[in-house]
From Swiss-Prot:
Description of what induces expression: Expressed in the late phase of the viral replicative cycle. Expression of late genes is activated by the viral late transcription activator C.
Organism field: Escherichia phage Mu (Bacteriophage Mu)
Subcellular location: Virion; Host cytoplasm
Entry protein name: Putative capsid assembly protein G
Job of this protein: Involved in capsid assembly.
Length: 156
């Protein structure tokens, strides 16, 4: 005696869930959250005067820069803030597959990554004081948004 057994499984709900998961990577909601988190982390870096990625405080002013600031009435003050132009210049952008943060200020890069005494057009021995980045709070906001979006997609 033989027994043939067939099981039919309706996979439409599974296919719909997979299709909905695919939309998670194609919408702009997550990159928008990422851009906002980058901006918030950067704003906090200026407040804390610390690298947003590591939390390490920025190097203090050089003696010559401190003297210049004192002579011109800019002490006390924040390390990367003279008039606030750099902090105000921060912009973000995002799209389906990216989130960006930056500044159009010509001096933005040297403050982020530092400079060397032999750099052209003149000596630029400036220590790196990273201000753009992603702190732990921003990272958590992004992960929470991803979890929420994926969870919503799977409930479909």
């Amino acid at each position: 005696m033989s027994l043939d057994m067939n099981v039919a499984v309706d996979v439409r709900r599974i296919q719909l869930a997979l299709d909905e998961l695919g939309t998670v990577t194609r919408d702009r909601a997550i990159p928008r959250v990422m851009a906002a988190a980058l901006l918030s982390s950067t704003e906090q870096a200026f407040e804390r005067q610390a690298d947003p990625d590591t939390g390490k405080g920025w190097e203090a002013w050089s003696d010559s820069w401190l003297a210049w600031r004192q002579d011109h009435g800019f002490v006390p003050g924040s390390i990367l803030t003279l008039h606030g132009d750099l902090a105000r210049s921060i912009t973000t952008d995002y799209g389906q597959d990216y989130a960006l943060i930056g500044s159009p200020k010509i001096y933005a890069a040297i403050h982020q990554w530092g400079g060397t005494p032999d750099m052209a057009p003149r000596p630029a021995g400036v220590p790196a004081r990273p201000y753009m980045g992603l702190d732990k709070t921003g990272e958590q906001e992004i992960f929470d948004a991803i979890r929420k979006r994926v969870s919503a997609a799977l409930r479909q």
